[in-house]
């Protein structure tokens, strides 16, 4: 029993010691009680055994080859980008798990810059790597960020997203990965210093520089702007990996202007911009090119690894629809299966969907919206039709509002 019959004092059910001036005992249901000291012991026990980092110091970090193999299951194409990212992530966590001793060489962070068109897989690559490493992951849109004191999001709000995705565990968040999308949109308006404030350009780059290189940041727990006397969350960004991505429209012309030279001698040829692959040009990007584009030199120096992504071809988009573990068509087939519908896509239909994404210039990002629009009526009708059903998608239905997919009932007896 929790209560001593003789003295009437509560007794802790765990340590069997009575309530006193130095021991507070809280009664619970069923005659159970616990003292404040046992509560403290339980809290210490939970904290000591709680797993805050799936990646531990035992050295069991996935190798670059294992990371790439995992990426291959979810991401089609972009072989060079996969290899570069796999090595960068491996080296980053290897560096964390082996902190330098006194007088040791200090290894700097391997932050990554991804250059590639919209829908080429930049976000998916970063997200899939974080999934494999089992670390918190956050996506930030650079276009929403503004310099402190102006309308918009503070840079620190990026860190708040990471903390929230780590369920409030600061230590776990400090091992996470942040993907900053559309980093090219915060380029300063010109190479010359302007007399007017560039609140969403160079000022944001300066603010990003601090958290990317590693600092102890103060984050408002509820988001928004900082206020005096407000309690702040403290987070060290030293071990957070930053992957930045952008389309960098116009950067190819800057690179072309630098590498193009006048022909020397008879028969000399100069490869024109129209004849060069965009990825081929991005592979030759130098820090000076990025400075001319509008990024500040200090920020470029903190993102040492740069890799170009290929523009996805129709063949790539066709494979994306059917091959990955979570391929879009596989997802829709599983969804329709729950309503007892067998969904099939003709090969020509899949190719037509890929071509439509190319025509719309949306890349892989636009594939899902195309299929969603195509399947809307069928998804609306399927739950109301009883029995085993079939739905076949052919080429004529793609982009043709007059030829909509229709569900066929296979077993009339069950209808």
Swiss-Prot record:
What is the purpose of this protein? ATP-dependent specificity component of the Clp protease. It directs the protease to specific substrates. Can perform chaperone functions in the absence of ClpP.
Q: Which SMART domains match?
A: AAA (SM00382), ClpB_D2-small (SM01086), zf-C4_ClpX (SM00994)
Q: What's the subunit arrangement here?
A: Component of the ClpX-ClpP complex. Forms a hexameric ring that, in the presence of ATP, binds to fourteen ClpP subunits assembled into a disk-like structure with a central cavity, resembling the structure of eukaryotic proteasomes.
Chaperone found in the keyword field: yes
PROSITE patterns xrefs: CLPX_ZB
In which residues is ATP bound? 117-124
- Extract the Gene3D superfamilies matched here: 1.10.8.60, ClpX chaperone, C4-type zinc finger domain, P-loop containing nucleotide triphosphate hydrolases
- The chain positions of domain ClpX-type ZB read 1-54
Q: Which GO terms describe its molecular function?
A: ATP binding; ATP hydrolysis activity; ATP-dependent protein folding chaperone; protein dimerization activity; unfolded protein binding; zinc ion binding
Task: Report keywords, A-Z.
Answer: ATP-binding, Chaperone, Metal-binding, Nucleotide-binding, Zinc
Family the UniProt entry places it in: Belongs to the ClpX chaperone family.
The protein depicted here goes by the name ATP-dependent Clp protease ATP-binding subunit ClpX
List the SUPFAM superfamilies hit by this protein, alphabetically: Glucocorticoid receptor-like (DNA-binding domain) (SSF57716), P-loop containing nucleoside triphosphate hydrolases (SSF52540)
* GO cellular component entries: HslUV protease complex
Q: Which GO terms describe its biological process?
A: cell division; proteolysis involved in protein catabolic process
Query: Which residues are recorded as binding Zn(2+)?
Result: 12, 15, 35, 38
């Amino acid at each position: 029993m929790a209560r001593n019959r003789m003295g009437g004092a509560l007794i802790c059910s765990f340590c069997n010691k009575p309530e006193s001036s130095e021991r507070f005992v809280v009664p619970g249901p069923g005659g159970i009680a616990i003292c404040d000291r046992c509560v403290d012991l339980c809290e210490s026990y939970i904290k000591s055994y709680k797993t805050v980092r799936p990646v531990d110091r035992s050295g069991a970090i996935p190798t670059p080859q294992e990371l790439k193999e995992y990426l291959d299951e979810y991401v089609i194409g972009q072989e060079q980008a996969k290899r570069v990212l796999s090595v960068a992530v491996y080296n980053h966590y290897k560096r964390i798990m082996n902190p330098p001793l006194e007088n040791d060489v200090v290894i700097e962070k391997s932050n990554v810059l991804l250059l590639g068109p919209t829908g080429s897989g930049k976000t998916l690559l970063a997200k899939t790597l974080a999934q494999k490493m089992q670390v918190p992951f956050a996506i930030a849109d650079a276009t929403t960020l503004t310099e402190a004191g102006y309308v918009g999001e503070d840079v620190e709000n990026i860190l708040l997203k990471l903390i929230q995705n780590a369920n409030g565990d600061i230590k776990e968040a400090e091992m996470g990965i942040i993907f900053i999308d559309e980093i090219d949109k915060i380029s300063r308006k010109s190479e010359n210093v302007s007399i007017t404030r560039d609140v969403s350009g160079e000022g944001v780059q300066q603010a990003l520089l601090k958290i990317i290189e590693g600092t102890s940041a103060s984050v408002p727990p509820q988001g928004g702007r900082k206020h005096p006397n407000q309690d702040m969350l403290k987070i060290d960004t030293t071990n957070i990996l930053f992957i930045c991505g952008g389309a960098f429209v116009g950067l190819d012309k800057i690179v072309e202007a630098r590498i193009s030279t006048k022909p020397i001698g008879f028969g000399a040829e100069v490869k024109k911009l129209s004849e060069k692959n965009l990825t081929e040009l991005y592979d030759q990007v130098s820090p000076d090119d990025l400075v001319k584009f509008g990024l500040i030199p200090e920020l470029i120096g903190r993102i040492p690894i740069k890799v170009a992504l290929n523009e996805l071809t129709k063949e790539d988009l066709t494979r994306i629809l059917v091959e990955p573990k979570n391929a879009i068509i596989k997802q829709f087939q599983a969804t329709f299966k729950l309503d007892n519908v067998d969904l099939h896509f003709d090969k020509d239909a899949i190719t037509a969907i890929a071509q439509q994404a190319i025509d719309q210039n949306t890349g892989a990002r636009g594939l899902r919206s195309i299929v969603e629009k195509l399947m809307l009526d069928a998804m609306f009708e399927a739950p109301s039709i009883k029995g085993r059903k079939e739905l076949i998608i052919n080429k004529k239905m793609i982009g043709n509002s007059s030829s909509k997919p229709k569900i066929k009932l296979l077993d009339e007896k069950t209808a």
